[in-house]
């Protein structure tokens, strides 16, 4: 099977969306290209005294709506094409929830599991020394991503402050930091909570009174999967009947044990499998369960043309990135299943990162309750913007999300005089 280039895929998705909107060819050509691509050498002194030089990237896709925003990935198979694609997709994600940002993304080709903690810190600081002049609170705001975390963000922020010789904190340069250095507590469950709000609104769109007693199956039990289980069962009264991880899943039609118990079992046994009071199922079986809502929250490409016709859920909430293939999209649409596309469904994380940045810039911090209320408002409006476009144009929810997002970026470009039409 020939693997498609990630950036080529991003361009093709943009071209598909353009069919459903009035956008000029010159604007479309501009949106197909990142506005800035930076490739840097990142030298690191290793613990044995030797020096290794790693390759790093920072891509800023479009800043028509504001500073670019996006995570920094550390991965041995990182490529410039992947970073360009992710920066492009980030532009649409921040636009669909109407954040005043453009899309950015960074990466380093490295296997962080082979580095000591001190080597990781030196890598983080060296990367910032290489890109400090293209990032900043009003320019480009990084965040955690694959194999990076709040601790690494704090090192990066500290290095940026040191280089810029600021007389005070530069908290706003990076989000996803620990609470003690400008981070916010509400970030932990933000992706799952944002997804929960879109699920609630999707239920309303289908005419359901509420979610109490409705069933949901969640594929994936990382941060997003665990918190989604916890929020949907404890706050929305849903019956979580199945969850899974990479080794398999568990099922109970009457509802699983509480999320904290499932997480405890997973930590002690390395998987959710074999938990008392449940029956083991495969990840494939989970996707085809008779449930009201299916939430693929693990990896991409799990719902394909081979199994899409067997999906029985009425709502598919794409908490993971790209869990449904384009061919499967068509099948789910024909079956009348309401999809919440990934870059809308999982935008809660970047939305709360935006809230962190706003609070850093203003030096005034909200309560967790206030942060969650603002997240609810953002995700609710975004869902209905997309759903109404889906109905008005009679197009797929994913296409509708692209139309909403691309239109907002296009409008900003016209206002700036970058394009005439």
UniProtKB/Swiss-Prot annotation:
Top-level enzyme category: oxidoreductase
Protein name: Glutamate dehydrogenase
List of residues binding NAD(+): 220-226
Disulfide bonds: none
Note: Uses both NAD and NADP.
Classification via Pfam families: ELFV_dehydrog (PF00208), ELFV_dehydrog_N (PF02812)
Compartment list: Cytoplasm; Chromosome
Protein's UniProt keywords contain DNA-binding: no
Xref: SMART domains: ELFV_dehydrog
GO BP terms in the entry: glutamate catabolic process
Family statement: Belongs to the Glu/Leu/Phe/Val dehydrogenases family.
Keywords per UniProt: Chromosome, Cytoplasm, NAD, NADP, Oxidoreductase
InterPro entries: Aminoacid_DH-like_N_sf, GLPV_dehydrogenases, Glu/Leu/Phe/Val/Trp_DH, Glu/Leu/Phe/Val/Trp_DH_C, Glu/Leu/Phe/Val/Trp_DH_dimer, Glu/Leu/Phe/Val_DH_AS, Glu_DH, NAD(P)-bd_dom_sf
Cellular component, GO annotation: chromosome; cytoplasm
Oxidoreductase in keyword set: yes
UniProt EC number: 1.4.1.3
CDD domains attached to this UniProt entry: NAD_bind_1_Glu_DH (cd01076)
Catalytic residues, chain numbering: 105
Molecular-function GO term, any one: glutamate dehydrogenase (NADP+) activity
Known catalytic reactions: L-glutamate + NAD(+) + H2O = 2-oxoglutarate + NH4(+) + NADH + H(+); L-glutamate + NADP(+) + H2O = 2-oxoglutarate + NH4(+) + NADPH + H(+)
Self-association state and partner proteins as the record states: Homohexamer.
């Amino acid at each position: 099977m020939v693997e498609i280039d990630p950036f080529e895929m991003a361009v093709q998705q943009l071209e598909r969306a353009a069919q459903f909107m009035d956008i000029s060819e010159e604007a479309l050509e501009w949106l197909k290209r990142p506005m800035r691509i930076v490739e840097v050498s990142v030298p690191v002194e290793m613990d044995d005294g030797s020096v290794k030089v790693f390759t790093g990237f920072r891509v800023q896709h479009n800043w028509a709506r504001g500073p670019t925003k996006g995570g920094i990935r550390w991965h041995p198979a990182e490529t410039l094409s992947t970073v360009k694609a992710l920066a492009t997709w980030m532009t649409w994600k921040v636009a669909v929830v109407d954040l005043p940002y453009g899309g950015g993304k960074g990466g380093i080709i490295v296997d962080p599991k082979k580095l000591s903690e001190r080597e990781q810190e030196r890598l983080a600081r060296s990367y910032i020394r290489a890109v400090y002049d293209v990032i900043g609170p009003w320019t480009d705001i990084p965040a955690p991503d694959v194999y990076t975390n709040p601790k690494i963000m704090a090192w990066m922020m500290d290095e940026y402050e040191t280089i810029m010789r600021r007389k005070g904190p530069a908290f706003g340069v990076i989000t996803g930091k620990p609470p003690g250095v400008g981070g916010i507590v509400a970030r932990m469950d933000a992706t799952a909570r944002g997804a929960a709000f879109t699920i609630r609104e999707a239920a309303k769109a289908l005419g359901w009174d509420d979610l109490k007693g409705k069933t949901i199956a969640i594929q994936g039990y990382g941060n997003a999967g665990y918190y989604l289980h916890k929020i949907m069962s404890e706050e929305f009264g849903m019956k979580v009947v199945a969850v899974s991880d990479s080794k398999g899943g568990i099922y109970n039609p009457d509802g699983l044990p509480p999320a904290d118990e499932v997480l405890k079992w997973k930590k002690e046994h390395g998987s959710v499998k074999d938990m008392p009071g449940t029956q083991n199922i495969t990840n494939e079986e989970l996707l085809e369960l008779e449930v009201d809502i299916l939430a693929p929250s693990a990896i991409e490409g799990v719902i394909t043309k081979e199994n899409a016709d067997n999906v029985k859920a009425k709502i598919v909430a794409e908490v993971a990135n790209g869990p449904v293939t384009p061919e499967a999209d068509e099948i789910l649409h024909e079956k009348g299943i309401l999809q919440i596309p990934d870059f809308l469904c999982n935008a809660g994380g970047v939305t709360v990162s935006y809230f962190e940045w706003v609070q850093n810039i203003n030096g005034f911090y909200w309560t967790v309750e206030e942060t969650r209320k603002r997240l609810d408002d953002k995700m609710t409006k975004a869902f209905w913007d997309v759903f109404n476009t889906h109905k008005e144009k009679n197009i797929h929810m994913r296409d509708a999300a692209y139309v909403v997002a691309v239109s907002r970026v296009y409008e900003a470009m016209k206002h700036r005089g970058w394009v005439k039409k």
